[in-house]
Regions:
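Conserved NTPase motor "head" modules and their coupling/switch loops across ABC/AAA+ ATPases, GTPases
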Residues: 1-31, 168-319, 328, 332, ...
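Hydrophobic "anchor" residues on beta-strands that sit immediately upstream
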Residues: 27, 89, 108, 319-320
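Conserved lysine of the Walker
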Residues: 36
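Nucleotide-state sensing region of NTPase/ATPase domains
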Residues: 45-125, 129-141, 218, 222-226, ...
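A conserved P-loop NTPase coupling/switch region
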Residues: 101-105, 112-178, 182-201
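Walker B catalytic acidic pair
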Residues: 323-325
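Conserved helicase ATPase motor motifs in RecA-like P-loop NTPase domains
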Residues: 348-350
Length: 354
């Protein structure tokens, strides 16, 4: 799917904007704050069905009653996104829908400057990033993740209800000092049985798919990193398993055994929602050991591999959106970046011509 043009009306700072795209690489040049990233955001929304950073109300240009995004493709098809201030609709092949149908969603590889902070950011943001990446080409992963998150929320809501409706629980030595300050209340543990089964099931499905993705990435990570950085540093991405490697039965038993503690805390303390993705640089954690340039090369290498894996899994060559990616890259590495994405349509933003 090749984009021919993108037109925006009342989208963020743009009252009207029109970009005619090239089949391979298009460059959007402008000062910081001129709305370049908003163009990538609009393209992403038309291809994926939602923004990567904001709600529709935040996207709507101040003082406007609606926003509109129109993406045209060289095959004659188009996708229109229309938000009237209250609800969003998609217009595809003369059909209006509240959500972009799956068959019209197209894979995207997205680079944002904030991605450089992946190494040092919080585990929750790293999980969110990789969950989005894996879901780009694995619908089963997306489904398991949605079910896990729904079940986790239901379990946490129930924990809070028990904590509110019953005396404070104890009998659990949270501080490791051997002191229990409150009367123990064993209440409702059986009500959590089904939630625990589902969390163990979906949790290990997610963990397995996360590990398989990293296995594929790590197979070529060093090779692709070398093509950018041109040095022999060793890079690796590891899945740090919260609670270690366990079976589904062990996962379930852990949830059962920590029921009283979870009631006190008001949330589920154990699970794959506590796993982390750790970047290694020469067998040490990259945070604090790799330079900013080395981190940028690691992230870009991941993007190249992501695009290739999406193509392998879906047969579709993703559209590549790169925001301010040339910053801090010399001419040689800029050319290398474009060369690595030679088989994809690439749209790049920059503060200057390159």
């Amino acid at each position: 799917m090749i984009i021919e043009s993108i037109k925006l009306v009342n989208f963020r700072s743009h009252d009207e904007f029109l970009l005619h795209c090239k089949k391979k690489t298009s460059l959007i040049v402008g000062e910081n704050g001129s709305g370049k990233t908003s163009v990538l955001e609009a393209i992403y929304e038309a291809l994926r069905g939602k923004s990567f950073r904001a709600t529709d109300e935040e996207i709507l240009r101040r003082g406007s009653e609606f926003y509109r995004v129109e993406l045209k493709f060289i095959n004659g098809l188009s996708t229109v996104v229309l938000f009237d201030g209250q609800k969003k609709q998609f217009l595809v092949e003369d059909k209006r829908t509240a959500r972009l149908p799956k068959k019209y969603r197209y894979p995207v590889v997205l680079f944002l400057p904030d991605d450089l902070h992946l190494v040092a950011t919080s585990p929750i943001k790293r999980r969110a990033y990789f969950d989005r990446v894996i879901a780009e080409f694995d619908e089963a992963y997306s489904s398991s993740l949605a079910k896990y998150e729904k079940t986790l929320k239901q379990r946490n809501d129930l924990l809070k209800k028990y904590a509110k409706n019953n005396d404070r629980c104890s009998g659990v030595d949270l501080n490791g000092d051997g002191i229990n300050n409150y009367r123990r209340v064993d209440v409702g543990a059986s009500d959590f049985f089904s939630w625990n089964i589902l969390l163990a099931k979906y949790g290990l499905e997610i963990r397995d798919k996360r590990q398989k993705y990293l296995d594929k990435l790590n197979t070529v990570f060093n090779q692709v990193y070398y093509s950018i950085a041109e040095n022999n540093d060793q890079v690796f991405l590891k899945l740090d398993l919260f609670g270690g490697e366990i079976s589904e039965a062990e996962y379930f038993n852990r949830l059962e055994s920590e029921f009283s503690r979870d009631v006190i805390l008001g949330h589920t303390g154990f699970g794959i929602h506590r796993d982390d993705f750790v970047f290694l640089f020469n067998e040490k954690e990259a945070d604090g050991t790799a330079s900013r340039g080395e981190l940028r090369s690691m992230i870009l290498a991941m993007k190249f591999i992501e695009a290739d894996l999406i193509f392998q899994e879906t047969g579709k060559k993703p559209v590549v959106l790169l925001d301010d990616v040339f910053s801090e890259l010399d001419n040689t590495r800029q050319k290398c970046l474009v060369r690595n994405f030679k088989d994809n349509q690439v749209i790049i933003t920059s503060v200057e011509e390159v």
